[in-house]
Structures are given as structure tokens and as C-alpha cells.
Amino acid sequence: MVMAAEASSQLSLLSDLTPPSLERTWLTAPHPTLPIVATCSSDKTVRVYSLTNFRLLSTISGGHKRSVRTCAWKPHVKGESVLATGSFDATVGIWRRWDSYGQTERGIEDWRHADSHDHVDGMGAAGINNGGGDSADEDDEEWRFAVLLDGHDSEVKSVSWSPSGMLLATCSRDKSIWIWEDLDDGDNNFETVAVMQEHQGDVKCVAWHPVEECLASASYDDTIRLWREDLDDWGQVACIKGHQGTVWCVDWEGAENVPSAPTDLADDDPVTAQWKKAHALSGPRLVSCSDDRTVRIWRRQPKEQHQHQAQPSPSGGSGIPSIIRPTGSDEFWDEECVLPQAHDLSIYTVAWSKRTGLIASVGADGRVVVYEERFIVGSTAEAMETDHPTSADGTAADSPAALRTEWRVIATVDGAHGIYEINHVTWAKRADRGRIEGTDEEVLITTADDGTVRVWTLKM
């Protein structure tokens, strides 16, 4: 893995989301299917904006007594939108709103085929009234505060739904991670499935694997931890060390990601096929960011590889039997690379695009940075033409290491929100009139201390 710095693309401000909050905003979460986002604010509210015209659709309030720090949309919900919110008041709220189109799939289909007037006037793409006055008040009332999840002893820092939408993970300053199951019984009942307390400090972030029920967490204790269920009991399967400061955020690579190439590669190209084969063995990678001003990427060792390397004894290799979890459930993660140094202060959020494979980072220096992974010219042909026996350390020759890649900084924006720190960044599908029809064009959304939320386009 090689790192390089070469800004070759341009980030341009498309629009602010208006009107902004008058207080600090923490995080913006794109809806999984509709062209809307939810923004968490220190004014105890969540604001829902349209990505078609960048206007405020509704304000969710009344559920929390302190700042709303985090939120996440539940996936795979038909006919309504479900939003989880986490607050400094130590509680988690579940909010529900019936979708005006009746079915999410129909709403998206109408969005894709709407004419330009539908993007600006009336009900908007999400079927939510964009008007002011009484209609806005009526819309706010349509958000139902369904249930309050109480259990944490201190500020809730992050919430995340599992890929199936049946599990909700929450984490807190109290050093704990809670997993709740949505019983989906029509009565808004949630059951506590697990409480994990292995972290030695404030837990800043939780993020679910894109396809598996595997949870990653990041903490003030400088570690990343991985959690899985084994025999109906949730527990830690890996503790990743490497950062020299608080780990603020973790995010997963998309399950189908393939690095960029000097020329476009078809899906059946041998290089693409080889990458996907090796990728399938280790699964999606993790990206993390920290107070130490680095962005790091981690890869799980395939089980066959770490069994070849370690061959542990039944007692766990040290002669001391494990009383916490069986050895067979442990995972081994390697630091694959540190991305090019691009920040001067703490990095608060990283976002790995599931569509393009690009990574974005933001932090205390007010800078937005975008990174791209590319196959190294010449390495693809070399990898395909050479016979690669298994190496002495057990690394298969057709691993991604044989197809060498490099990470480049392709775009930066300094002072993206003036003098203010940027708390969060995320990718979302572009939905405004300027989008290119028939493409999965994305926008980058940044959320900052000044209360503004900005939408950016990336010109490659």
C-alpha cells in the first residue's frame, strides 16, 4: 500500500440547507431511500431538510431535554420513516412518521420521474409539505415520539441501526454500548439485548458492518473494538490498537467496493475478479480517525491466515484459559495503511462512500479532505501474469497486496465553514435539478459548529 498526495478534483459548494439552526449542529443523516436528511442540533431539535431544494421540511422537537447529538434512520421500513435520536440527556428517542406516498418504493419512483416543478414547489420529493405557516405546524405534528429508551447514565454519543433494521446500537460517555432489539410488535416495544462495558473511556461512535451483524466502536481509550453475537451472548471479538489518541469515528467500506483503475475495468475483468475474490475472504475494511490527526484503514485477516500464523493451543496460546470468550471467536485485524497526512488538528469524522469508494474526512481545522484509492499502474498486469505461491507468513499471493493500491488526496477545502470546526461529514445521493440523470452522482454534506449544513459537489 502506497500513499500519495495529489489534489486532482474540485469540491464546490452547491448550497446551504436553509434556514440553518441558530445553535451548533452535530451530525446530518441521509435517509436510506428518500431525498431527505435529518440534522441534530444543540437546540434540542432535529431538522429534516429536502435534498431536492435544500429547504427545511419539518422540525422535530419536544422529546429531549438537552442537545440532540446523533440520529440514524431505520432501514427497510415500508410506508413510514423511523428515526432514532440520541441526546446529552442520556436518552434515545424513536420517532415515526407515515410517508405521504404510502410506500417508500413508490415515493422514490415518483422522485426519479418528477418534473422540475416537483423539485421546488408543493409537496417536494419526499411527500412532505415544504410550505410555512399552519401546514408546517401540521407536518411537525405528524412526527410521533414513539418511545424513549432509557438506560445510559450519561450523554449518548452515537446511534446506529443494524443492516436488517432489527437491532439498534447506542453508545455513551458512560463507557457502555447497548444493543436494543425492535420487537416490531406494533406497540413500539424494544428489548435490551446486550450491554457491553469493555471500553475504558467515553465511547464516541458505533457503526454496523454493511451486511453482517457485527458492530464496530470507537473510544476515548484510543481503541476500536469489534462485537459479535455468539451463542446468544454478545461480546468483544477484537480490540484494535494503533491510534495515539481518541478515536472519534469508524466507518465501513462498501461490500462491493473496487479501487479505481488507470482505465475503466469491466466487472468481469480478471483484475476486478481477483480483487473481489480476495476482498470476499477478509470482508469490508474499516476506516478510523483520531485526535492523533491520522486516518487509518484496517483489514481483517481471513481465518485461514491467522490460524496458519498462530495455531493457538486449546487454552488460548498463553496457557491461561479464557473465561470471557472462546478463542475460536476472536478476529485479527491488521493496519493496512495510514492515509496521506492532510489535517492539522483532530479529525472528528470519516465517511466511506458505499457508491464510489471515496473517503472524506473533517475535523477541528475546518478542512474537508477527499481521498481516492487507485490501483498502481503496472501492478495489475504484474499481478495477473505472475504465479503467486503462498508466502511463509501465510499471506495468499492473490490477496489485495498482490494488486498494489495507493491512496491520494484528490480534493480539499480549507475553511469550509469559515472559522468553525466541522463536526460531521457524510455522502448522499444527489437529488436536485442539477444532477445527471441515470447516474448515482453523490454530494458531500458537512455539519458544523456555526449551525450550518453545507452540500458540496465533487468534480472529478
Curated annotation (Swiss-Prot):
Put simply, this protein is called Probable cytosolic iron-sulfur protein assembly protein 1
Alphabetically sorted, this entry's keywords are: Repeat, WD repeat
Does the record bear Repeat in its keywords? yes
Cited SUPFAM superfamilies: WD40 repeat-like (SSF50978)
Compositional bias, Low complexity, is annotated for 312-324
Q: Which InterPro entries match?
A: CIAO1/Cia1 (IPR028608), G-protein_beta_WD-40_rep (IPR020472), WD40/YVTN_repeat-like_dom_sf (IPR015943), WD40_repeat_dom_sf (IPR036322), WD40_rpt (IPR001680)
Coding gene? cia1
Q: Which GO terms describe its biological process?
A: iron-sulfur cluster assembly
Q: What is the lineage of its organism?
A: Eukaryota, Fungi, Dikarya, Ascomycota, Pezizomycotina
One GO cellular component assignment for this chain's record is: cytosolic [4Fe-4S] assembly targeting complex
**Sequence similarity:** Belongs to the WD repeat CIA1 family.
> What Pfam families does UniProt report for this protein, alphabetically?
WD40 (PF00400)
> Where, in residue numbers, are the WD repeats?
17-59, 63-105, 151-190, 198-237, 242-308, 342-381, 416-457
Identify the stretch(es) annotated as Disordered: 301-325
Q: What does the UniProt record say this protein does?
A: Essential component of the cytosolic iron-sulfur (Fe/S) protein assembly machinery. Required for the maturation of extramitochondrial Fe/S proteins.
